[in-house]
């Protein structure tokens, strides 16, 4: 590779990474304009919120739903690999960020907040803080980069472990969350209420 080719490649990658940062900034600004609270209404920031059905859930840096966002990164890396295989990694990351940021904006809209409150056990869910939502997106990026480097079997094993572990501990995980949002099952709702 010539010096000119290397310089072009760096500049091209830089464009994609700047676009990625712009998506995250747009997500944060949009959530602010939607009236989302910047941080937990409690007035402080925790590294980890271990309560599930508490007012602090989805308000701090990480929580029991963080593994779900890491799995999003695994899945979105796979999607990007399938449809943008010839594009740079940063272009695939941009696709992942657009999907994740779009989900975060939808998840924090009145439509989805009300759906969570009526169809799932999340009766006290009022949406994420901007900080938590941004960190959800960052954790998706962590999963994305992990999947880009790790063997597929390891990535799949970690995703399965996350699903089983969070399902066991909090009776919720990515699979159950999607199922209960799209097609609520009363028996699962009752089981989840036993936490």
Swiss-Prot record:
One of its GO terms (cellular component) is plasma membrane. It comes from the Bacteria. The keyword Repressor does not apply. HAMAP family: UPF0314. The lineage of its organism: Bacteria, Pseudomonadati, Pseudomonadota, Alphaproteobacteria, Hyphomicrobiales. It is a multi-pass membrane protein. This is UPF0314 protein RHECIAT_CH0004233. Belongs to the UPF0314 family. Pfam families: DUF2585. It is found in: Cell membrane. InterPro entries: DUF2585 (IPR019691). The chain crosses the membrane at residues 15-35, 64-84, 127-147, 150-170. Keywords: Cell membrane, Membrane, Transmembrane, Transmembrane helix.
